[in-house]
C-alpha cells in the first residue's frame, strides 16, 4: 500500500508542477514534427499519440506534421496516423501540404490536423517534414515548434549524463562553437 501511495503522491507532484504550463499554453498552437515513424516501435508511437492527445485535452491546439517512409504511400501513412489519434479519443484528420485556411478551420472545429508534406508536382519521393513544420509554424503563428528525433537530445556535458530539456537559440550557437558535433546535429537543428 505504501508503494501505491508513493505513486499517487508522485503523480500529484508532477501535475502540480505542470499546472503553470497548462495555464500558460491554453489555446496555444503547437506544431509537432516527428519525421519517420520507423524509429518508433508500435508502443512508442502509441505513447506519442497519447501525449499529443494529452496536449489537446489540456487546451493546446496541436498540429502534427510527419514524414513518410520511402516506398510507402504518403496518403495511407497520413490516414494511419490520424486513425491512431482517433483511437485515443480525439478528432483528427489528415491533409496534404500547407493550407493554412484548412488547418485553421480544423483547429477551430476541434480537430487535430495531421499533415504530410507535399510537392506541387508530386515528383519528389521525399520532402523534409522539418521544413514543412517550420513553414506551418510561421504561417499559423504557432507558439511552439517541436521537432522529435530518434536522438536522445543535446547533452550538457561530454560524459553524456544529462541532456537539455529546453534550450535557446543563443545556447545552441554557443554549443556549436564549443563542441564538435556530428553532421546529424546540424541537420536536426536546421544548419545542414
Question: Whereabouts are the PLM-identified features?
Answer:
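Ligand-binding beta-strand-loop-alpha-helix segment within the catalytic cores
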Residues: 71-120
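Polyanion-binding loop/helix "lid" in catalytic or ligand-binding cores
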Residues: 77-86, 117-134, 163-192
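Alpha-helix C-terminal capping segments
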Residues: 54-58, 135-143
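Glycine-rich phosphate/pyrophosphate-binding loops
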Residues: 140-158
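Active-site catalytic microenvironments in core metabolic enzymes, especially phosphate/sugar-handling
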Residues: 45, 51, 58-61, 65-83, ...
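Generic hydrophobic/aromatic pocket-lining and core-packing "Φ" positions
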Residues: 49-52, 103, 133-134
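N-terminal glycine-/serine-/threonine-rich phosphate-binding loop
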Residues: 1-63
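Structural motif
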Residues: 29-33, 63, 112-117, 121-122, ...
Amino acid at each position: 500500500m505504501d508503494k501505491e501511495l508513493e505513486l499517487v503522491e508522485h503523480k500529484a507532484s508532477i501535475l502540480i508542477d505542470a499546472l503553470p504550463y497548462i495555464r500558460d499554453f491554453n489555446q496555444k498552437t503547437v506544431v509537432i514534427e516527428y519525421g519517420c515513424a520507423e524509429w518508433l516501435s508500435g508502443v512508442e508511437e502509441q505513447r506519442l499519440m497519447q501525449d499529443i492527445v494529452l496536449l489537446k485535452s489540456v487546451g493546446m491546439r496541436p498540429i502534427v506534421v510527419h514524414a513518410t517512409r520511402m516506398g510507402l504511400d504518403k496518403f495511407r501513412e497520413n490516414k494511419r496516423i490520424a486513425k491512431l489519434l482517433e483511437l485515443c479519443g480525439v478528432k483528427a484528420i489528415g491533409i496534404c501540404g500547407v493550407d493554412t485556411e484548412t488547418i485553421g478551420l480544423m483547429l477551430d472545429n476541434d480537430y487535430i490536423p495531421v499533415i504530410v508534406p507535399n510537392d506541387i508536382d508530386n515528383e519528389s519521393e521525399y520532402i523534409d517534414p522539418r521544413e514543412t513544420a517550420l513553414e506551418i509554424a510561421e504561417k499559423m503563428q504557432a507558439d511552439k515548434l517541436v521537432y522529435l528525433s530518434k536522438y536522445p537530445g543535446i547533452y550538457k556535458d561530454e560524459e553524456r549524463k544529462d541532456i537539455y530539456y529546453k534550450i535557446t537559440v543563443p545556447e545552441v550557437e554557443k554549443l556549436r562553437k564549443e563542441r564538435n558535433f556530428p553532421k546529424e546535429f546540424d541537420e536536426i537543428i536546421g544548419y545542414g
